[in-house]
A protein has these predicted regions:
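Asp-based, Mg2+/Mn2+-dependent phosphohydrolase catalytic module
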Residues: 1-205
Length: 205
């Protein structure tokens, strides 16, 4: 979209036009790096006019997932059940939030926008049900995370410990350690702790 096209949208909105958007992704991953997404262009119009869009046809609304259930059902009268579906994506504030809003299990994949730090600090409405490095791990069962005591969480052979303002893990190259760290961080935040003040591990996955 060119500057002139953006300007024409702004002029129309200033004159009272209502507008809907396809999605609100601020960024999108491209071959050469991270590029501005539709949400960044929308924000330009909002900055110029002070007027928000009336709705989004895409995520984080769950309508896209609901429609997919109907399409997948084919000629059946009932859509595919939510329990048989999995919302998959690389963005917490679109893909995962849409799944949570719609009542779907969700899976965050680390090959796109989201990084381990964002996962550990995610508020409840942005937290995925599952975490994988890449889509090849869809073929693998994800181990459960368990609290072995008040400060230590385990996932398979990996552990995460949160004490004295520091979250540490057994192996920062292990996806199970990230899963354990997320469980520890989320529990801490849900119990009223300030996860922003906690020293978090640097993962290399």
């Amino acid at each position: 979209m060119t500057w002139q096209q953006m300007a024409e949208v702004s002029y129309a909105v200033e004159r009272g036009a209502l507008y809907l958007v396809t999605n609100r992704d601020l960024t999108i991953p491209r071959e050469l790096g991270i590029a501005p997404g539709c949400g960044s262009m929308i924000q330009t119009v909002i900055n110029a006019t002070g007027v928000e869009q009336i709705a989004s046809a895409g995520k984080p609304e769950s309508a896209m997932y609901d429609e997919a259930r109907l399409l997948a059902a084919g000629n059946e009268t009932e859509p595919v059940s939510r329990e048989s579906c999995l919302a998959i994506g690389d963005r917490l504030d679109t893909d995962i939030e849409a799944g949570n809003r719609g009542g779907y299990d969700s899976l965050a994949v680390l090959t796109g926008v989201t990084n381990p730090h964002e996962l550990m600090t995610a508020p409840a409405h942005l937290r995925p049900s599952y975490i994988v490095r890449d889509l090849r791990e869809l073929q693998e069962a994800q181990p459960s995370t368990d609290a072995s005591d008040g400060n230590v969480w385990t996932c398979a052979d990996a552990t995460a410990r949160l004490e004295d303002g520091s979250l540490t893990v057994s192996d920062a190259t292990d996806i199970n350690a990230l899963r354990a760290a997320c469980a520890a961080a989320w529990t801490y935040a849900d119990n009223g702790g300030d996860i922003g003040s906690v020293s978090l591990p640097e993962f290399s996955l």
